[in-house]
Amino acid sequence: MNILRFEKAVYTLPILFGSALHIDRVAKIQKYSQSKYNFKLPIHSFYGAPTNSIWNGGRPPYYNDSMVSNKTKQYYKNIDAHKYLTYTNYLAGDYLDDPVSNLALKMLSKDDGVIITDERLHKYIRKTYPKLKTKASVVKITKEQPNERSAEYYNQLLDRYDYILLHPDDNTDLDLITQIKDLSRVEVLIDERCTRNCRVRDLHYDINAQSNIPIRDRDSNIMEQEGTLWSKYCPREKAVVLKNGKEKLDILVNTLDEIQDLYNMGIRRFKTSGRGS
């Protein structure tokens, strides 16, 4: 009897360089599943970035375990999944010599990888760390094509990257997805908590990027920008009224039926959001 709805699907989870407690709990569940049921959980990779990495473009983690140190190599070895560093800062190309970011890469193994926004960083990693896989990030796609993406655009990314993320706005655009040439290398973020067609998504990414670069290089009013974004512009709290009269937040979390449609089309890689949690 098949106990999995999506039998051939694999998942990537947001706990790399997050809480050691979460990593430990997932590891115990993996071991228990293997020993008790002879079943390897379909976790393809963990993703995240060290808190002191300039190349990090997402929410900076603040766990004691999120620093790169002489214990990091063993930390990597203890993880029963591939590791993907979230180096999605679009300003990363200005700091290619960042020692923390480079050290975290050097300790990765073959077929681990990097999630990238900046093409300068992509070229640098291809040249300096050729054993690593590269993945085009949602941030990259948003910065380059904030309003609408074409199949041609996605196919061009597939020519350069090992894997690509689909923009969450496109997760239900089945006509577009059918035109992407290799769905086995497309990953879908299934629980995006931003709203569809958000007009300030790229601004949010700008603020995240600024927050991770040295203080001397940041916009002087970065804190004010962030406050204004959340208080005036972010539409995440907007609700839609359903047919039954109840309200539902207009966010991009996919339903099981929507995931089933993607799976039936040939997509096998699914990603959950978060960062260290």
Predicted regions and their residues:
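Active-site pocket-lining/capping segments in soluble small-molecule metabolic enzymes
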Residues: 2-150, 160-277
